[in-house]
C-alpha cells in the first residue's frame, strides 16, 4: 500500500509539472505570435492588428489575456476588459518570466487566479538610437488547468485505491 501511495504521489507531481510546462509553452507561443504581429508607428505608438492569434483574446473575461507594457503606457487585449489583473512590470530585453498562480478578481467579482508568461523585447527597427524596450505578457485563468488536474487526480487515486484493495 505504501508503494502505491508513493507511486501515486510521484505520478501526481509528474502530471502537475507536465501540465504547467504545457501551459507555459502555450502562453509563450501566444506571446511570440503577438510579438510577430505588432508594430510601432513612426510616432512610437503601438499598432496591434484586429485579428488576434486566438479568438478568446477578443472576448471580455474569456480567461485568456494579452498585455503589452511600453515605457510610456500599456495596451490590453479586449479580453482584459472586466477582470482586475495584476499589472506586469517591464522586463529587461531577452528576459522571460513564467509565474503563477497570481490572484485576480474576475468580471463577476469572484476571486480567481492566473498563470502569466512575460517576455522582454526591444524595438529597434529605426536603428539603435531609436530603440526602446517593451514587454509582452500573456495570462490564462487557472480554471482549465485546475479542472484537468482534478479529473486526473480522481482517476489516479480511484485506480490506485482499487489496486490497493485487490
Where are these regions (language model features)?
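Extracytoplasmic
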Residues: 74, 79-157
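Surface-exposed loop/turn and secondary-structure junction residues enriched for glycine/proline
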Residues: 7, 41, 49-51, 60, ...
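Juxtamembrane segments flanking the first transmembrane helix
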Residues: 1-72, 147-150
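Short, surface-exposed, polar/charged, turn-prone segments marking secondary-structure boundaries
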Residues: 32, 55, 93-97, 106-107, ...
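Short linear functional motifs in flexible/disordered or boundary regions
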Residues: 39, 43-46, 78, 128, ...
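Alpha-helical transmembrane segments of integral membrane proteins
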Residues: 3-8, 12, 156-166
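General N-terminal targeting signals
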Residues: 32, 44, 51, 63, ...
Amino acid at each position: 500500500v505504501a508503494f502505491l501511495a508513493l507511486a501515486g504521489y510521484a505520478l501526481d507531481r509528474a502530471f502537475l509539472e507536465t501540465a504547467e510546462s504545457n501551459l507555459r509553452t502555450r502562453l509563450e507561443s501566444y506571446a511570440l505570435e503577438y510579438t510577430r504581429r505588432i508594430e510601432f508607428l513612426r510616432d512610437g505608438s503601438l499598432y496591434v492588428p484586429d485579428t488576434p492569434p486566438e479568438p478568446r483574446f477578443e472576448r471580455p473575461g474569456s480567461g485568456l489575456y494579452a498585455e503589452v507594457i511600453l515605457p510610456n503606457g500599456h495596451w490590453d487585449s479586449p479580453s482584459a476588459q472586466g477582470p482586475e489583473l495584476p499589472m506586469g512590470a517591464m522586463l529587461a530585453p531577452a528576459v522571460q518570466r513564467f509565474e503563477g498562480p497570481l490572484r485576480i478578481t474576475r468580471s463577476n467579482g469572484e476571486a480567481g487566479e492566473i498563470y502569466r508568461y512575460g517576455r522582454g523585447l526591444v524595438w529597434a527597427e529605426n536603428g539603435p538610437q531609436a530603440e526602446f524596450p517593451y514587454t509582452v505578457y500573456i495570462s490564462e485563468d487557472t480554471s482549465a488547468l485546475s479542472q484537468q488536474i482534478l479529473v486526473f487526480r480522481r482517476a489516479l487515486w480511484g485506480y490506485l485505491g482499487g489496486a490497493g484493495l485487490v
